[in-house]
Design a protein with these regions (language model features):
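Flexible "arm" and connector segments at domain edges
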Residues: 1-108
């Protein structure tokens, strides 16, 4: 039986498939395709995060983080670089801890 995926997978997935006595049919993406597939994967992981809770949500957040690492590497940056920028933004603009919901802004 054949199952079609047509999506970016983690590096060890072909080995895991082979260990299950199945044959993965793969190809290596070019730079443009890789970027596009990472963007699709980020959206896919986002949707999974929204639909999960508890430890499942943590697992999905970890998947999302892995995609973010790969996207950062396309910009010749690391996850540490992303975290540094996030900290700088937190210092300047704050975090989301206070649960502030901005309804509107009135002119004085």
């Amino acid at each position: 039986m054949e199952q079609v995926y047509n999506k970016l997978v983690r590096d060890k997935i072909p080995e895991i498939i082979e260990s299950n006595n199945e044959i993965p049919i793969t190809r290596i993406l070019n730079d443009k395709e890789y970027k596009e597939e990472l963007e699709k994967k980020l959206y896919e992981e986002y949707q999974e995060v929204i639909g999960a809770n508890g430890m499942d949500r943590i697992e999905e957040l970890a998947d999302m983080l892995e995609v973010m690492k790969a996207l950062a590497s396309l910009e010749n940056k690391t996850l540490d670089d992303v975290i540094k920028v996030a900290r700088e933004k937190e210092i300047k603009r704050g975090a989301f801890n206070k649960r502030i919901y901005l309804k509107k802004v009135l002119k004085k």
